[in-house]
Amino acid sequence: MDSAPLLALTLIVGVPVLFIATRIFLYPFTGLCLWVLLLPVTKTMADLAGYPQDEGPIMLQKLTLADPVLLLTAVGALLNGTGSSSRVTDRQGRRIIILLAAFCVANVASAALGETGTESLIELATNFWLCLSLVLICQLLGSPDRLRRTLTAWEGAGVVGCVAGGVGTLLMWRGNINNLLVQDGRVAGLFHGINQLQSFVVAVIPFFCAGMFSRAASRSARVLYGALVLVGFAGVVGSGSRAGVVIAALSVWLMLLFASPRLALVWTCAAVLFAGSAWQVLGKHLDELPYGIRRSFSYVQEDNLELDELSRGRADQLQTFYTVFAEHPLVGVGPGGFAAWVPRVVPGGKAQEMHNSYLGVLGETGAIGGLIMLALLADAMLRTFRFLQWASRARDPDALMAAQALLVSYASILMYGMLNYGLRQRHFWFVIALTVALPHVYMRWRAGARVAERRTRPFYGVVPCVE
């Protein structure tokens, strides 16, 4: 390439990147919003550089576009301050952060005493990165306005993720089974892994449902939210996840149950009445559908629902977990070390990580790390329940809608974690951060708003009020 075109290309790419980097360094909250927008983009640098799936330098396989953004945000917040005088510092919120830090320490101990050795360094760096992101979010989300803008960025990320999944399903339907959005006949969107798409969609759908079922939202806004829910659901179907389809449908039903119990009962009765005939029609034409969709509904044609028949790989992992936990009950085999044990325990078994998040933590970090993580997850769930109870007593429709969306979103990704390992996914920890920040900021705003006559709702335009 000649020097002139190369210089022009460098300027075209370098100037915007330099501007964004400077903006993030000077205003760290801008970096947080950009990081949230990049949550549905987990294609690694190796993918973008053209390497085949899971090949290339190990650092490029782990590095994503959002990682430099988070690093600049952290440096900017450290050197320039967070720009917010109010931080999430209530006792329960601090306890969740401390539990995550304790889990990182347990990972270090497990890596030192386990069998993985230096192979655990990447996993340790990942856990540290997740802890850093949680602390940053809680430090930067100290005001209602910032929380509102962050939730707007979260919905924007949901639009990107759902639309990418929907477009991927359309391409797969037309026979294009390998492209940027489809991997081997299954939709992955802009995610590096197929399971990441499913987990992200079930986490963001409740927030779209909050807008779709809101009486205060305009008709066009409700139609738009409804379309996003359908497109996101289509992406989950195209990804070939049987569990993802069930959990996504359940999250929509739970939000409908919160909004209108009678309407939820009507839809439930209609589904029960027409499920049998729809099941038969789907079973007859299932072989004509693309692979991803066919896989999502493959249990329609199954006569035996035993785990060994449905998923041999999961059965091998469960057998491996029993052996691993029996031999390493306290500190586990080390972060990232479970996969190597599968072929050692099960002859001919495939080396892959445990699909169950909670059993995977117990196997890799033992009872010590597993109990710390389970305590963290339980504490976050308790916090969402308390926020929902507070919002119900406060009779604030805006807070109630936000609490319902947060509870369903968190419960959905916890259920999904029973079937796929999701504790390393960034959007999972973003939802955890929302369980820490959202109740604190809203209760603080509510207490301060009693003095003021006119006030702006923290979630106005994001989770519309039902008034």
Question: What kind of feature is each model-predicted range?
Answer:
Residues 1, 15-23, 74, 101-112, ...:
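Alpha-helical transmembrane segments of multi-pass inner-membrane proteins
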Residues 1-82, 109-113, 430:
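N-terminal signal-anchor transmembrane segment
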Residues 55-65, 183-196:
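Short aromatic-rich membrane-water interface segments that cap or initiate transmembrane helices
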Residues 63-69, 95-105, 117-142, 158, ...:
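Aromatic-anchored transmembrane helix interface
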Residues 72, 376-379, 405-467:
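Transmembrane alpha-helices of multi-pass inner-membrane enzymes
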Residues 178, 301-319, 323-365, 388-391:
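Long extracytoplasmic/lumenal interhelical loops at the membrane interface
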Residues 181-190, 279-319, 340-343:
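Flexible juxtamembrane loops connecting transmembrane helices in multi-pass membrane enzymes
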Residues 365-412, 439-440:
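Hydrophobic transmembrane alpha-helices and their immediate junctions
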